[in-house]
Every structure is written in structure tokens, then in C-alpha cells.
């Protein structure tokens, strides 16, 4: 499910001139938008959730020779792989464990932080969860295998990365506590912090500001702290269930290979995965209405000692509610009507129909068709529905038979939707190279800053696109 760029081997194979290198890993990048961003209508604004790992974590691990093999977008020395008995199959994932075997065998893994391939990410929330839960279980299984000698054959820097990974695997526990704690405090009348707002801001504000900016700076603005919390919140409770399973039976079979290319044909709310968040959100609304509404309406007297710190509790509850609301909205799968993905490739082209020539350029392009902007000097009135012709991509030397689906004309330009037909194997190969095998502008990593990410998250709640969008069959 990954397509290498034409310069992939040129940028990676040279490392193997040095005999110490056993594997060269490159980042994974995806041509279809992350399901969170797509469902929220933010496809062109927000990065994939793996940006933090490939843009920040992997380069950090590279400094200590502890890079993780990620299953795709890498090159491995065959003799090194054979020396450890081939790919490791003792866990539910093989890539991470194989890289550990290489490292414990005295090997060295390099990381080239350069986009050299494109792949397909999961398109549905359930598939995303299944993939991430399988990764979580595979990461935990490493510490139960006796033939992976992490603590005896790795140096202390490499061991430190594995210790940090253990803490990362238990991050859903911390996330669950942060979601439930303010709710329990409100219902049981025990404020987690007995302090005034100025006192709290004096200590907490510098940390919050530093964390937000340092997180963005250290990741090259590839991922914001707030957007990262949406991912963690959506993943939290399913991950807790998997963690409990792993602690009871580490090698229980709970996941299969990730489905790719599967698209939703109707709106799917995924209540089975998000109902814990919906329950917490409902209890939050009920608690705020009864607790603070009772004070405001005079139903019960204010206890001054109990009320100390309640302003902070209120802000905590509202913030959690916003993050949970975005996580729930992002989990509502929206139907996909296109059979293939389209990309905003602009290239000069020539359309020939019935001995008439139309010049223009592509607005977007896919393996199945394209949208054209045509020169108004042509006789666009002669362009009709279902006409057959030949579309030539002048710069690429590629010509494909096509059919006109729609045509329209404005004051200066004309537009036409084209569907390819009778595409040969050679033509399809050229289309794939044109679409996937080079670093075009739309494939560059998205880098929203923290403020933009927060505003997009707040706007997503008010717009409620996943709920309000109406899709006709």
C-alpha cells in the first residue's frame, strides 16, 4: 500500500556502502487525508497523526541508534536479515521486533527524514482503532518475549528509549484520569486544587505556555499539543480495554491485518467505540447544570471552602468537553463517493474531439479522470456530454482516450469533467508515476501552528459538519 518515489533508492542505498548499516528507514506519508481531518472537513489543514512520530520521535531515536522499523518505506541488507533468522514473527507485528533483533545483534539502523514514498492510511474510524490497538499490543509484547534481549544487549541510551515507550503505552491511563478526575471532583464535592485563580495561573500558566510552544517547536509545527489531545482522547478507552487484555494475556489474538482501501458508503456514527466519551460528556452537562445552576438560582447556599478552586474545575471540565466533542465528531465516518483519490495536479493538456482541439490545463487528476479548465478561444459550445476524444498531457507525453461527463462555460474560461476509458497497462503506469512518484507541493507536510489548530478545533464544534452533512445516495 505504499508507492516509492522515483529517487527512493538513490536516497537510501548509498548508506549500505558503510558495512555497519543494516537497515535504512524513511518516513511514511499518506496521500489520503487522515480520517479525523476528513470527517471534520479539515482535510487540507491538519496533518496525519503519525507526523509526530516520523517528524520528531524517529529523528530523536536516530541519535541513539534506536530507530524503529515501520514495516514499509525502508531498505534492509539481506545478509543482516538472514543473520537474525529473517523477520520476527513471535508478536502480532513484525517490523518493530525485527529492528530490535537487528540492534541486539549489534546492528545499526539509519533514519532518513525525507519524504520518499506515499501510502494509503486507514479511511474509517474502526480501521484506525484496530490498527493502533494492534500496534499497542505489539509494543507491549516486546517486553514479554524472552528472545528479545533488550535489557542485556542494548546500551543505556537505547534502553532509555524502550523505557519511554513503556510509559507511552500506558498514556491512555493518564488520559482517562484527566477526563474523569474533574467530573468525580464535581460530583463528590472535592476540588482537586484548593487555590485561587491568580495563584493557579502563577504556577500553571508558564508551564502550559511553554509546553504548547515547545511541543510545536520540537515537532517542527507538524503537530500541535491540542490536536494531539483529540487523537489521544478518541483512542483512550478502546486502548484501555486492549491494555487490560494484554496484561492478562499478552499474546491473545485480538487484531488482524489493517484493512486498506475500504471506504464508508454511508454515515457511520461508531457509537460502540465512542459511548464512554458520550457518557462522560452527558454527565459533565448534567453536573454543571445542577451544581452551578443550583448556586446561581439560589437552590442551595455556597460553601466558601468548597467553592475555592471551582473556577479552575469549571475550565477543566469545559476544556475536556470541547476535546471530547471534537473526538466524537471526528469519529463519525462520512461516505466517500469517489472511486479513486484525486490530486490537485496542474499540467498543460490538449483535448481533441471530432477534429476540434481544445487547449487548457488540469485542475485535478486521478487514475480515473480529470477536471479541466479550457481556453475560452475554443468553440466550447461544441463540447457535449458523452462525447469521446483523446486527452494529451503535453509535458508528460501521455495520451489517453476519454469521455466528456460534464461541460460548462463562463466569461473567460470553460470547464470540463473528463473520464478516462480503455486505459492500457502502460498508460496506467505513467499515471501512477505522475500522481504518486514525485514530491509535489500538495504532498508537503502540513504545519499548522498551535493557535490555528485550536481555532480549527473550536470551529469544528460550532459547524458540526459530521452531524449536519446530508449525503444523497
Residue ranges and their predicted role:
Residues 1-3:
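The conserved acidic donor/metal-binding loop of glycosyltransferases
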Residues 6-92, 104, 125-164:
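Long helical/loop segments within the catalytic core of UDP-sugar-dependent glycosyltransferases
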Residues 92-98:
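Acidic donor-binding loop at a coil-to-helix junction in glycosyltransferase catalytic cores
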Residues 101-117:
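Catalytic donor-sugar/metal-binding loop of nucleotide-sugar-dependent glycosyltransferases
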Residues 113-127, 215:
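Active-site donor/metal-binding and catalytic loop motifs
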Residues 122-137, 224-225, 254-260:
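Nucleotide-sugar-dependent glycosyltransferase catalytic core
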Residues 168-253, 269-334:
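Membrane-embedded multi-pass helical conduit in multi-pass membrane proteins
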Residues 269-473:
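Structured alpha-helical
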